[in-house]
A protein has these predicted regions:
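A short, histidine- and acid-enriched strand-loop-helix "catalytic/donor-clamping" loop
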Residues: 93-94, 114-124, 179
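Membrane-proximal helix-turn-helix segments that form the acceptor-binding/catalytic region
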Residues: 105, 118, 133-181
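N-terminal subdomain of nucleotide-sugar transferases
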Residues: 1-33, 79-81, 96-99, 103-109, ...
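Short, flexible loop segments at the rims of nucleotide/cofactor-binding pockets, characterized by
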Residues: 61-66, 87-90, 156-163
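Short beta->alpha connector loops
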Residues: 1, 68-70, 91-94
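Short aromatic-enriched loop/helix-cap "lid" or pocket-rim segments at secondary-structure transitions
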Residues: 7, 35-41, 99, 122-127, ...
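Short N-terminal targeting/anchoring amphipathic segment
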Residues: 75-95, 109-113
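A conserved catalytic-core segment of Leloir-type glycosyltransferases
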Residues: 19-85, 141-148
Length: 182
């Protein structure tokens, strides 16, 4: 569904590609607000964490960082449909980097539209919890996001984003899996 700017670009891209005669296979999260898709059986169950309690957020920390269900469902989709290319819009904190090794396994080229600064700033914005310009994480010292409460001034959100950034730094750097950035 059209939640914000990135989702609008996602749907506009689908429309443009289909007008050019391409088959577009969406892969996303399940949500009651989603538009119907013939592929929704492959969509991933994942809660809206912004509306979740601290306990719920901790319960989902592992899938926030590495979502096994997303990897399994993407692999099933690839095996059925055999796509030529993958175009990623949003994956962090939901589908997660877990989808990248699956795409690489099947030698599917990956393009990513970059809608924010997430690749270099855990909180997406280059601002700290007080709204000041911030580059503290530029040398991959992501704990600053946590200590400065950069995500909506909340400790738990900032903690989760810091953990996710360290995980990507040490295990699944998107830079190593994505062929082109837009």
């Amino acid at each position: 569904f059209r939640k914000g700017g990135a989702e609008t670009v996602f749907f506009n891209t689908i429309q443009l590609l289909e007008k050019q005669g391409h088959t577009v296979i969406p892969f996303s999260l399940k949500n009651p607000k989603n538009e119907h898709s013939d592929y929704e059986r492959f969509f991933v169950n994942y809660p809206e964490l912004s509306e979740s309690s601290i306990i719920e957020k901790f319960k989902h920390l592992t899938s926030f960082v590495y979502n096994r269900e997303a990897a399994k469902k993407l692999e099933a989709l690839i095996q059925q449909e055999r796509p030529d290319i993958a175009h990623i819009h949003l994956m962090f904190n939901s589908l997660s980097v877990s989808i990248l090794p699956v795409l690489k396994k099947y030698q599917i080229p990956v393009v990513m539209s970059v809608h924010d600064y997430r690749l270099v700033c855990p909180a997406y914005t280059f601002t700290d919890g007080e709204g000041n310009f911030c580059e503290r994480c530029k040398d991959k010292h992501y704990y600053h996001c946590f200590t400065h409460r950069c995500s909506n001034k909340t400790l738990i959100n900032s903690f989760m984003l810091s953990i996710d950034s360290y995980f990507r730094k040490h295990f699944y750097s998107p830079i190593e899996y994505i062929d082109r950035f837009i």
